[in-house]
Amino acid sequence: MDSLKIIEHARRLFAAHGDKAEAEAAQKASAFEADGDSEQAEVWQKIRAAVHEMRQGHQS
């Protein structure tokens, strides 16, 4: 997934879940990792990082 799609997905997740979005993304990443899907786990880690950045900006 390219960077723009990751950011867009993070925005939608943040809009839907607010401050819980980062935890939601982390859970998805863990679930994919547990299932052996490291590619999707990496995508969700990137989404989590993007949500984290959004939360930091939102708190300022």
Residue ranges and their predicted role:
Residues A49:
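N-terminal cationic and glycine-rich segments that engage phosphates or anionic surfaces
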Residues S38, E42-K46:
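Short, charged, amphipathic alpha-helical segments
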Residues M1-Q27, A31, D35, E39, ...:
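Long, non-catalytic architectural segments outside compact domain cores
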